[in-house]
Amino acid sequence: MKLWPIALLLLISLAAIPASADSTYTWNFATTPNASLGTNTNTYYSNGVGINATGSTNLFYKQQGGIGGAGETGLGLACCDSDHEINPGQSIILNLSSLFSKNVTGVSLMLGSIQNGETGQVCDAFESCVTFGSGNDSKSVSIFGLFTDMKKHHSGLLTISSGTGDVLINQVQVTTSAVPEPNSLILMGTGLVGLAGMVRRKLGA
C-alpha cells in the first residue's frame, strides 16, 4: 500500500498552521531620574501594549544609588516625604486588562528599595496577594498565579503597596505564546478529516 499521498496530505495540513513564537513584553517604570510626572496616572507601552498606572498621589520617577543594600530605582509617589516611594497606606494600581486577550504564559514583577525588615505587598482585587521581602529586592518574581486569578475574575487591577517600610515598582515582564488563527485550525481539521478518510479507504481496499 502506497502511503505517500497520506504523508503529503499530512504535510499540507501542518503547513496551514503558522509557526508559533513566544513574545516578551517589558515595562520599565523609571525612565527619568528623580522627576514627578505631575499627575497620578500614566500609561506605559511595550510593543504597542499599554499598562496604566494610577497612584494614590502623583507618580514619581526615582533613580539613584542603593541604600541599605536595596536598589533605589523605580516608580514611586511624589507624596509625602523626600523618599518619593510607596509608603504604608499608599499604593499604585496597575491595570493589566490589556493582557487578557493574549495567550499569557508568564508574568513577573520587580520591586525595589526593599531593605532588611521591609516588605512589599502585591494584591489583586479579590484578596489574593504576593509578599515581597528584602531577598526579592530588584529581582523578578513570578506573579503568574495572581494574574491567572485576575483573569478568572475579569479584573485587571493589581495593587502594589508597602507592608512595612517603603517600596518602588521597577519592572513588569510578560511572555506570551502565539495562538493559531481560527482559519488555520479549520484548514488543519479539514486536512485531518481527509487523511482519516483516505486511511479508511486504503484499509478497506
Segments predicted by a language model, with ranges:
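Short, threonine-centered small-residue motifs that mark membrane-proximal processing/anchoring sites
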Residues: 5-8, 15-23, 170-193
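Short proline/glycine-enriched turn/loop motifs at strand-loop junctions of beta-rich domains
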Residues: 104, 114-117
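Short, surface-exposed beta-strand/strand-loop-strand elements in extracellular ectodomains
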Residues: 116-128
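C-terminal membrane-anchoring or membrane-association module
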Residues: 196-205
